[in-house]
Curated annotation (Swiss-Prot):
This is UPF0181 protein Ent638_2380. NCBIfam families: PRK05114.1. InterPro entries: UPF0181. It comes from Enterobacter sp. (strain 638). Belongs to the UPF0181 family.
Amino acid sequence: MFAGLPSLSHEQQQKAVERIQELMTQGMSSGEAITTVAQEIRATHTGERIVALFDDEDDEE
């Protein structure tokens, strides 16, 4: 579980995607671009935050 994740509007999400794509066109790997943008968002985000639970177990048995 992750607490305090930024809650982004659709517009904010779109801007993040565009920023990731911009960094990738400048030669940055996708993973590095995603990490960079995530750090930028965490550093500047002032809106709501959410708690997220990621379940990696495969329930299809």
